[in-house]
């Protein structure tokens, strides 16, 4: 298999793991490839953002921007299966309801939704809709840009934890086993390159502001997760992705960035 075929294979594995989009039948999957596929987390975000932006732009022909945003949000959840929202809810339940590290990790593994998780989900979705609606008031086209950039950069931030933090859950039973293995500089370079692609859409100054803001957000999440559970789990990566996505929308709104 040639180099480009190997990379395409890894991208489709990442797409199949992080979304509900089916992989082509010719894709070769094994444990090693599954671990290396995290390098394309950002590109998968670009894809999810582009699909959501396309639905938003299409719906603008028939409904108001605020309603079109709801359809875009529904689309992203359908495409990903609520993968990251589930992580946010589990993280909120675990950190909010557990008194010890072991208790927090056990609560995160519980698929049932608790009060902390429900509150986190509702507040995150409301804030996401409100931020995007405010962007639409400034310029309806800016929402499409925000969706693409936000979905990509937030996944770059979340996946970057794999390269610097310790995985603290049981790798044998975890549903996020591909996120548990630390990767090398090649994987990190490809991950960051996908973030650069998104930043090219916003211009130099907004890009620098986004980088600075997301570095601060990442640091905050790292401090939180280290103090609470000593590292990260797949669920906390979902929480970091959702928090970073909301941060992107907030920063783009403050900057007033549009196409």
From Swiss-Prot:
CC terms in the record's Gene Ontology section: plasma membrane
Residues that span the membrane, as ranges: 9-29, 43-63, 64-84, 118-138, 143-163, 196-216
EC class of the enzyme, as a word: transferase
Keyword Membrane in record: yes
EC number: 2.7.8.26
Pathway in which the depicted protein is active: Cofactor biosynthesis; adenosylcobalamin biosynthesis; adenosylcobalamin from cob(II)yrinate a,c-diamide: step 7/7
Annotated keywords: Cell inner membrane, Cell membrane, Cobalamin biosynthesis, Magnesium, Membrane, Transferase, Transmembrane, Transmembrane helix
Pfam families, A to Z: CobS
GO terms for biological process, alphabetical: cobalamin biosynthetic process
Function: Joins adenosylcobinamide-GDP and alpha-ribazole to generate adenosylcobalamin (Ado-cobalamin). Also synthesizes adenosylcobalamin 5'-phosphate from adenosylcobinamide-GDP and alpha-ribazole 5'-phosphate.
The protein, known as: Adenosylcobinamide-GDP ribazoletransferase
Organism (species): Shewanella halifaxensis (strain HAW-EB4)
Encoding gene, per UniProt annotation: cobS
